[in-house]
């Protein structure tokens, strides 16, 4: 299949991967600033936006990573938000020679809550799966609300996400279902331990999908990585706090 990419600007290559249910247009608010310094690549992950799935595929994390690897510049800085952070992390494991650095935003190597691990309650993801089977659009709306929950600009954040989501074709049900499966099942905590790439982890302290309690655990597990927490942000800090987010990225990437 062909993965759709939108490109802006000139400079070092910076590739942005969106999260579950979204598409590459979600970055449009910060593109002008980033494109003044970087060659920005906005990817639509398979099954989302302008990257329709071609027939039946085994929608696994390694498969997703290979599909994205096929359209990456020879070397780049790779940024992934939420589910896109899992894809970016898998790429860092499978193709470290292609990356100058890894940036994960509001993401976790293990999204699902487990023994002594804070994360999304299993019943929440199970609820989304049930909703998907019944009301596709309502499920997306509910997820938008959860992403903005806690943000002091929650209503504006949701409106902005909804606007950008509508700029491209709706996500395919198969990709939504498979994506929820990845959020429920993938656990890269041990695999990422030896990662030697420069790695920046960006969080919103008010995020209800990536609990703040996981941040010090990840700091301890990955001491060579750096973490930055936006105190008043939730799951979409690049939308609620764009200027602060841009400064964080520019400071790290250079």
From Swiss-Prot:
InterPro entries: AB_hydrolase_1 (IPR000073), AB_hydrolase_fold (IPR029058), BioH (IPR010076), Carboxylesterase_BioH (IPR050228)
AB hydrolase-1 domain ranges (all copies): 14-242
Cited Pfam families: Abhydrolase_1
A single BP term in Gene Ontology: biotin biosynthetic process
Active-site residue numbers: 82 (nucleophile), 207, 235
Gene Ontology cellular component annotations, sorted alphabetically: cytoplasm
Catalytic class of the enzyme: hydrolase
UniProt-annotated location(s): Cytoplasm
Keyword Hydrolase (UniProt): yes
Reactions mediated catalytically: 6-carboxyhexanoyl-[ACP] methyl ester + H2O = 6-carboxyhexanoyl-[ACP] + methanol + H(+)
Keyword terms of this UniProt record: Biotin biosynthesis, Cytoplasm, Hydrolase, Serine esterase
MF terms in GO: pimelyl-[acyl-carrier protein] methyl ester esterase activity
Coiled-coil parts of chain: none
Pathway(s) of this molecule: Cofactor biosynthesis; biotin biosynthesis
Major localization listed first in the record, in broad terms: cytoplasm
EC nos: 3.1.1.85
Described function: The physiological role of BioH is to remove the methyl group introduced by BioC when the pimeloyl moiety is complete. It allows to synthesize pimeloyl-ACP via the fatty acid synthetic pathway through the hydrolysis of the ester bonds of pimeloyl-ACP esters.
Membership in a protein family: Belongs to the AB hydrolase superfamily. Carboxylesterase BioH family.
Protein's UniProt name: Pimeloyl-[acyl-carrier protein] methyl ester esterase
Species, as recorded: Aeromonas hydrophila subsp. hydrophila (strain ATCC 7966 / DSM 30187 / BCRC 13018 / CCUG 14551 / JCM 1027 / KCTC 2358 / NCIMB 9240 / NCTC 8049)
Lineage: Bacteria, Pseudomonadati, Pseudomonadota, Gammaproteobacteria, Aeromonadales
